[in-house]
């Protein structure tokens, strides 16, 4: 530096600012290079190439002097371009570090030459920038020495460059020498800092009092009430004051790094009185400090190695050993501090939440609290995540703090409160700056009599800028920029801290105190987020993912801490603050890490709440099941009888019966049941989930409640399906009424979550239950609709035909024969089917109906094949049914008549079950949506039948459970069987009715066709034929345009003729003649097209009357 330069031309302030910012960027880049080289996945491929292994060994051995013509380096020839491209970023990062080191050394020399006076209490910003530069330079050179592949990377790149360009890269000689010099970075730096030790020592000595004050124990903090904003109620509105506000929230770890590295680099100063004590005090605080992110510095070991061998430093080495031995005491000190901080910050949060107007006057105390809490958290993290030296009797468990989540939560609460009331702070400090500050500044400036023109301009600009401020700027949303003012103040500190300057800063302490407060106030206007990040940024957890996740899991498992677990996803929003513009390539990896972490935490919280809720629901369902009527007999028996057992002493021991609800009677409030504990855990966890509506993380917004809603939906869906207890192998399923009862009990339990979380459980229920009305849910899993449809169609209806189950119109259910283990009525009575309708809803019942129609279509398809097989005989029967002799002969020629009747019965059974579920659905919907059902009924009755949209109306009515003349679902199912020519179609289906008509008399020869008056049903379900004939005729005629009334009249005529011929048969052969006669009456009664006068015209009513009399006289074995 030329001595002719004036103090303003030296630009010390600007250079310090730029170099500190660039130093952080260089640390970021060298950090990423170190991590990349130590990870096999990201390490440059050239360094692991077997073919280049001899070349790399040669380069490392000869570094930095290498013979480019050496045979070992020939392998690089073919890949020189790839090597230069792959390693250029690494190489030029080291070049930038070398240039940074040179510029920093030049600036430190210039500062020494100018005799700048440093005092943290006088020129805070200048002193801080100076000490930061020293620490940054030291950390950077230590990081360089930790890159294991530095020689191979630099040598390989330079050799490839030389082979390509015919010369060595211009920076390589100096760079190679720097790598050699800084193999032992501390010793080399100590040599270089010999000329600077006077300035460094002066700056560090100004820290002694501050460090002692900030290193007090937690008990001393508590006694001094350093973080209490209500310790003096009379002064609660008085703003927090300090001569140097930034010192109040300056972190101890920062001061500790300054002292350790500063005095160690200038180790000659350690012999000075008072300095050794401060240095030893810093050495006793743990065993490591942070270099950068998760790179730590084991200072006892490193300082010992540095001073070992130096003459006259035996006492200093002894001091290091003594400090290491006393390290265990710091664990208890920090634990006591954290205990105080938890209560103090919680108290502060509660007061500020009630009175946010105190944020302005008490902002300095808030930042102070956040600062020391941040410092304690960082201390704990780095000591928990790095093993203590083996010689010390300390384990990682000694550093673990189970209440860390509480402290993290308190920090996040204060941060969110400051961010929430940002405009309040801006209004307060704008008024402060434009009022008190500018008034006092004018008075202070007037007292300064002699100053240069540059200094005068700077102070005038202060007054002008502050005078132009007003609250209206805040109200209009104007952005403030005070960075120029702060830089001018730093310049002013540099100008007036040089020896011989006029005026000197130390002679104008009023100006210093005022401008320090102005800078502090300005930061709380335009740099609120940056100031918060400075004192409470927890992005360090991004680089300790294992510890971060482990702490979260422990917090989630600890009922006393679970309410604070929301702090962990909130901290993920800090991760992006650690990125640097000097290393943009790390933004995406860190951003992805933050997104995956917040997603993991919120998902785990929601899953834990779901698991607890599932246990609560299970207990509630068990209690609800105790009130079922199926348990009534057992409970009455237990209440009536006294269970007594005799012990060895022949004494009677009474076993007390515990009725349902006994758990609600408490003998003591202190006794907690397992359900109480679960509810308490759920309450705490829900408090965490509902703490915030949204968590912003790297341009994404996460909503914790939505995670809980998603988990509840998944849990509720699985629970509903599991309640059905569908067992495919054993063909079992739970009764619909039981499932519905359990679902309602679970819904009642889940609805209680609204008291804790505000989650819209109605939306959860609607979403899940609506999916359960479909055959598959949104995840592709089977639903209860699919399960019940499969069971009723593939299991139950098959049993109807094979196990002697009968459909009883009188009971409106299917019933069993006596002695059967399976009770069909438990699945088909009115209550069960109404419960099924509630579970499956209109969509699910329609799906069940569609599947039944497909089965009917399958049966009709087989009937069609049988009709075509017997077509000629049926055509003859159709024209000769009134000729007995020919008719009998033709009937004998028919094939598979029993098969036709069996299939008609099957169709009738399916249609009867369809009728039952339609009636159940109609009943349920009339209760749930009476107005809508009345509208549907009115439209069905009054909509014109000739209109083209009539089919749509019928489909709507059928879907609502109402009965239509022609079932549109059946029509749609049978439409696939339609012939191309309608004449052929009409003939085929007409012959089917002829086949059924002539086949009915065959039922009279079977014992199973007997009619049961109690059930109003035939034992073989032959009475269901009436439903199949009417429904199929209506659907087939609707599809092919035929007249169903004509077809049924023809069917009635042929059937009557066939049945009347039974009178000529012998009585002993006709086992159920009267029972079969009743089928004619049933067909007419259920038909919308036929009337009784049509029946009387072809079949004597006297026979029907006698048949009814005859069948009701018989006594049948009762059905269950």
Curated annotation (Swiss-Prot):
A cellular component annotation (GO) from this entry: SCAR complex
Keywords attached to this entry: Cell adhesion
GO biological process, one term: neuron projection morphogenesis
Superkingdom assignment: Eukaryota
Family listed: Belongs to the HEM-1/HEM-2 family.
Subunit structure of this chain's protein: Part of a Scar/WAVE complex containing brk1, scrA, abiA, pirA and napA.
Function: Involved in regulation of actin and microtubule organization. Involved in cell adhesion.
Protein name (record): Nck-associated protein 1 homolog
Organism from which the protein derives: Nematostella vectensis
